[in-house]
């Protein structure tokens, strides 16, 4: 790591290292404090350490990169594409030759959630800016033939079904009625077909209030390495429903923000609301399954502590969707809902 920093700033001294909170991935983050060096040497930089070249779980499931995996880090590949279309990404200062580490611009410690919930903050304005940025990014991020990995994978019927199965396998009590589970699978298969028929655009995939930072009055976007093609409202649903976000984004504010996005993106508001509900329901079911998987299989109990917020969101969207009575009932009677712990938030 020291050699990686010195390659970028030969005259700088490493004055200190401190851990930075990460997320569900195999990546770890450190903040390096730097002294001296050339005029372009920042006071701090972020060091990302990777256990492997890692791609998203479903990317592996779809085998889009073949048995040997991607040729380069997806983070670097997607960054190269996006950085020509927005200045919201952190700069990549250096990447290790073996792809086990990279040095990034430090975009601070203020996720969008903290900015929106700070005393005196205007949540509608904060989240609205994030939606404006998203709409602009979607409008500019067309495939240019440069080899961006996002255009090699998409939320198609197969992937939607895979994520629904992930929910059934890990999010529901295995002792639930076999008949109810069979009907749930049939309902979600039909929903996967509806979702797969929607037009697809460039999608961050985890565009939520902890992957957006407010840094020196600018919104900065991180964790974009799992980008793919998906319905346009998927990232909107991610932003407005992830984790504890519905504590802040009530139905009235949600409706206002969806209208703002629709106007900025140039899509009919009624179509945006319908697609939003479908995407939000699919995504929150995936999250219920994923958080249980992370807690039970990967040994990360903090994710189980978020489920008491996530499960009510799943029930709310189940009530908005036609044709899912068995799924709706299982969300009431057989879902694994975790236990609350404020420290996990």
Sequence positions of predicted segments:
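Juxta-kinase regulatory segment immediately upstream of eukaryotic protein kinase catalytic domains
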Residues: 1-13
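ATP-binding glycine-rich phosphate-binding loop
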Residues: 15-35
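Active-site acidic catalytic loop and adjacent metal/ATP-binding pocket
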Residues: 26-33, 46-47, 137, 189-236, ...
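ATP-binding pocket architecture of kinase catalytic cores
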Residues: 33-35, 39-156, 161-162
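A glycine-centered beta->alpha junction motif in the catalytic cores
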Residues: 50-59, 104-119, 165-175, 239, ...
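An alpha-helical support segment within catalytic cores of ATP-dependent transferases
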Residues: 142-153, 158, 163-203, 268-270
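Active-site activation/catalytic loop segments of kinase-like enzymes and analogous catalytic loops
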Residues: 165-174, 232-267, 281-298, 310-318
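ATP/Mg2+ or Mg2+-diphosphate-binding catalytic cores
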Residues: 289-345
